[in-house]
């Protein structure tokens, strides 16, 4: 057989990169600027036995390549790359180590931790400067040539506009492991997420875009395995083109199973966004294993210390950092992104530690090579691009600094909203966050949707834990409860953790509604953490990255137990869809429209009057209203159907506040749509109030009113503007 393979070898082409089957054979292409020889290793179907090593015959523009006739999908392979082993010069070539193809689309076998995986001899004098001659192939996963054919039928991307986007962040495994409608054999898999009952539920929430935690092939950290834990979240990538085998039923159908899931989501009108980790790899620092990039071309792929190239720049906190200033690294990342869009049909990406991607030799640059590559790319520039705009390096915090076309996680929104609802942030701090954080994003023609607003995410407390714990409880992570954020801006409402106190539980439930309502009534793009809609808990663990168990898995029994909260979320998303003024494509203007004498946004105090300067500087200003008047539309072309007028009242005081309803005419009437103190306010119920009437706003609650155009008999016509009503605002339950 080896003689047959060698006889079918042709010179091939340098592009496309990776293993590309053209129907007659497979072209193998691998970039390495400093290698002296590259061997293609072919294995049996299970990846257990090496059949032959074939030296790639050609080297063009720093790319090694060759073509094998009659080798196609299902062929199992890896690489051995020869070159200098000079760690102090940044080179770590070791042909004894079988390497993963950076462009591999599928894998067979699993990584089994062994000292042979390391390019140096562990424990030997000289540490990583030594050279290890053991063969790592028995312990390595192997690459598989993939068949890209797939019948998408009529499935197409829903192309949800940014202004209608509501993101729902979840984890493939955690979301399905305990779902009663998912067959046991599908749990934890892409196919489980594609079960009709799962998709129907997600769709019913009113969200538009499902953001999946990393699905690229990743490695479980050895230190975690030694503790009986795993790298559950998956932020430890080793293959940027391959779906992780853990999430597929048949490892030889990984690409197809992922595509089937995407097709089912698209058929339901839901987008699929991937959380991607292009900032580092699973190979760690100089003491990490040699699995792929480190052995292919360490000097080119990684950022090394300028004066000590033995060591890695660690702006990620994981041991290494990909060099996104190198053209071939940029090419690999953009090739990967295009693959997931064009071949796998995903609709966007959230970039973990996104600042890394824009780092040039002198630091962050919003005109970096990678960002410019995305901006000009006809494929990537049309999908959703979301940055986590920080990293661990110097000058790493860059919220608001990404270029036009990008959205960004807005941690200032998260922190300020959390502070407000525990009484620690006044109106002056909350107001900018409510109208799209214009102070951060209103530049370069960016739109309010550039602000990804969130209260909770995978990293940190769940919503239920945010209102139930003052302190992290990460003992299960086996790091002496020292990992995870120490300052969470959380408030347990009086008791730490679960309680039987009815008053505490009622306050917690109201606080959760306050957070959800604030999120879905704010300008910008809202993101919900899966399970928050029914009060999922992680038992106070705010860093469950290593918990592949009940701590992280969604408990679906809570969906029935807390059905009222689920219904509240559905009501809020429906209101956001109904009122375009809540999701404007332009930043709201506080300037008066001279033609009609109205402002798009007016901030009002509890007296129903516009807030005065001294109130803006009052650190105790915890009750105020945001009046959104769609009739003004002070900027841009006037949009039909955008002329609703809404009043949102926020009260973070402990006590009830009488709030006088404002109006621009004696006939102004307000319909109560939401009172977070009344979780079961009937959807069809109409409680209507006149301008000047006072509504008793319960302590720590939020109200939403809409301006009524028609007369309703429920209005107390004896009221005068500014006079308080003796009628109860609504039935308290």
Regions found by a protein language model. Give the residues of each.
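Substrate-binding/active-site clefts of carbohydrate-active enzymes
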Residues: 136, 159, 171-346, 353-379, ...
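Carbohydrate-interacting/catalytic domains
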Residues: 1-168, 173, 190, 499, ...
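Core domains of carbohydrate- and sulfate-ester-processing enzymes
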Residues: 83-151, 222-230, 235-236, 268, ...
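A generic secondary-structure signal for well-formed alpha-helical elements
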Residues: 75, 83-85, 174-175, 179, ...
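Conserved, mostly hydrophobic/aromatic
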Residues: 30, 79, 170, 202, ...
């Amino acid at each position: 057989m080896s003689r047959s393979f060698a006889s079918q070898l042709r010179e091939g082409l340098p592009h496309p990169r990776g293993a590309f089957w053209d129907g007659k054979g497979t072209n193998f292409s691998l970039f390495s600027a400093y290698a002296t020889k590259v061997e293609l290793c072919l294995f049996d179907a299970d990846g257990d036995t090496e059949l032959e090593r074939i030296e790639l015959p050609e080297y063009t523009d720093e790319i090694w390549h060759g073509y094998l006739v009659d080798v196609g999908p299902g062929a199992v392979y890896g690489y051995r790359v020869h070159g200098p082993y000079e760690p102090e010069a940044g080179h770590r070539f070791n042909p004894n180590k079988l390497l993963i193809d950076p462009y591999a689309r599928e894998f067979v076998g699993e990584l089994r931790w062994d000292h042979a995986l390391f390019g140096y001899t562990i424990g030997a004098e000289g540490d990583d400067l030594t050279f290890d001659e053991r063969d790592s192939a028995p312990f390595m996963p192997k690459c598989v040539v993939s068949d890209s054919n797939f019948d998408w039928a009529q499935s197409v991307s829903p192309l949800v506009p940014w202004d209608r986007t509501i993101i729902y962040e979840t984890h493939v495994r955690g979301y399905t492991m305990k779902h009663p409608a998912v067959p046991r054999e599908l749990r934890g898999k892409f196919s489980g997420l594609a079960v009709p009952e799962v998709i129907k539920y997600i769709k019913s929430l009113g969200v538009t875009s499902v953001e999946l935690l990393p699905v690229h092939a990743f490695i479980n950290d050895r230190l975690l395995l030694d503790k009986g834990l795993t790298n559950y979240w998956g932020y430890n990538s080793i293959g940027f083109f391959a779906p992780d085998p853990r999430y597929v039923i048949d490892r030889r159908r990984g690409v197809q199973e992922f595509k089937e899931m995407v097709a089912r989501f698209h058929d339901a009108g839901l987008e699929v966004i991937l959380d991607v980790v292009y900032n580092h790899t699973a190979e760690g620092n100089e003491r990490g294993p040699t699995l792929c990039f480190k052995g292919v071309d360490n000097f080119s792929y990684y950022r090394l210390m300028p004066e000590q190239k033995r060591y890695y720049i660690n702006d990620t906190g994981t041991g290494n950092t990909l060099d996104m200033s190198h053209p071939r690294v940029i090419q690999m990342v953009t090739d990967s992104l295009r693959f997931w869009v064009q071949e796998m049909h995903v609709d966007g990406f959230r970039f973990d530690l996104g600042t890394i991607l824009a780092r040039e030799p002198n630091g962050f640059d919003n005109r970096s090579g990678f960002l410019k590559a995305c901006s000009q790319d006809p494929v990537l520039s049309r999908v959703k691009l979301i940055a986590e705009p920080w990293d661990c390096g110097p000058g790493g915090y860059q919220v608001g600094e990404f270029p036009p076309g990008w959205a960004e996680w807005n941690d200032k929104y998260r922190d300020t909203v959390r502070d407000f609802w525990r009484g620690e942030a006044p109106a002056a701090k909350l107001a900018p966050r409510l109208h799209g954080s214009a102070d951060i994003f209103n530049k370069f023609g960016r739109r309010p949707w550039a602000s990804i607003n969130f209260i909770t995410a995978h990293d940190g407390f769940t919503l239920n834990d945010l209102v139930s714990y003052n302190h992290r409880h990460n003992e299960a992570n086996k790091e002496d409860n020292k990992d995870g954020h120490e300052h969470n801006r959380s408030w347990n409402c009086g008791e730490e953790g679960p309680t039987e106190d009815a008053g505490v539980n009622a306050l917690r439930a109201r606080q959760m509604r306050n957070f959800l309502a604030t999120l879905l009534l704010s300008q910008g793009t809202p993101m919900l953490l899966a399970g928050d809609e029914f009060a999922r808990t992680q038992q106070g663990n705010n860093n469950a990255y290593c918990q592949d168990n009940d701590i992280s898995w969604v408990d679906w029994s809570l969906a029935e137990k807390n059905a009222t909260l689920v219904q509240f979320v559905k009501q809020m998303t429906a209101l956001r869809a109904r009122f375009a003024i809540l999701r404007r494509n332009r930043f709201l203007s506080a300037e008066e429209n001279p033609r009609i004498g109205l402002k798009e946004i007016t901030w009002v105090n509890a007296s129903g009057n516009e807030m005065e300067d001294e109130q803006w500087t009052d650190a105790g200003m915890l009750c105020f209203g945001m009046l959104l008047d769609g009739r003004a539309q002070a900027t841009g072309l006037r949009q039909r159907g955008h002329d609703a007028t809404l009043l949102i009242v926020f009260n973070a005081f402990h006590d009830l506040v009488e709030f006088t309803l404002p109006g621009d005419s004696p006939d102004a009437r307000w319909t109560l749509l939401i009172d977070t103190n009344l979780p079961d306010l009937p959807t069809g119920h109409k409680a209507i109030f006149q301008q000047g009437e006072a509504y008793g706003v319960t302590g720590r609650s939020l109200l939403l009113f809409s301006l009524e155009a028609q007369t309703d008999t429920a209005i107390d016509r004896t009221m005068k503007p500014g006079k308080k009503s003796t009628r109860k605002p609504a039935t308290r339950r």
